[in-house]
Amino acid sequence: IGAEIQSSPENVFTNQLNYGEIKIGKDRYITLTASDAHAIQKAHDILTEEACNPPTIKALSKMVFLNEQKLKAGFSAKYHMSISEYTNSIRMTMAENLLSTTDLSIDEIAKQLGYNYSSNFVKMFKKTHGKTPLAFRKLKNWYIYFIYFLLN
């Protein structure tokens, strides 16, 4: 969905200031109110907290009292990525941290990040970073030892 936000004036019927319009098709727009924008921010906060076990879009829309289409379009327009891309980015950042700072196995890291199968974690990590989690860990460790060697 290509999304583009445009400002719009006060809505005379609801007496609410429109937050903007999101283009969702050639001639289709969704209007967001300030209340909708607040719900999208709340959804973002929930996803940040629950990235390892994110709610479905249907459940998330009920949690923030916003229909699924507005939630998906508004989230993409505000954060320039889909809801699943956002949760994956958080998980991958957490994975980088765990790989760099712990000796946990790839299976243990995958479980901590909410993956039922470590192979799915490895595929997503490789897609995101261009290398497997194990290769990432080895490269990070090599880099740390190299810096240590240079400083001593």
Positions of PLM-derived features:
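DNA-contacting interfaces and partner/effector-binding or oligomerization modules
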Residues: 1-12, 152
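A short, Lys/Arg-enriched amphipathic alpha-helix from helix-turn-helix/homeodomain DNA-binding modules
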Residues: 13-54, 88-104
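Residue-level marker of structural boundaries
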Residues: 52, 80, 92, 104, ...
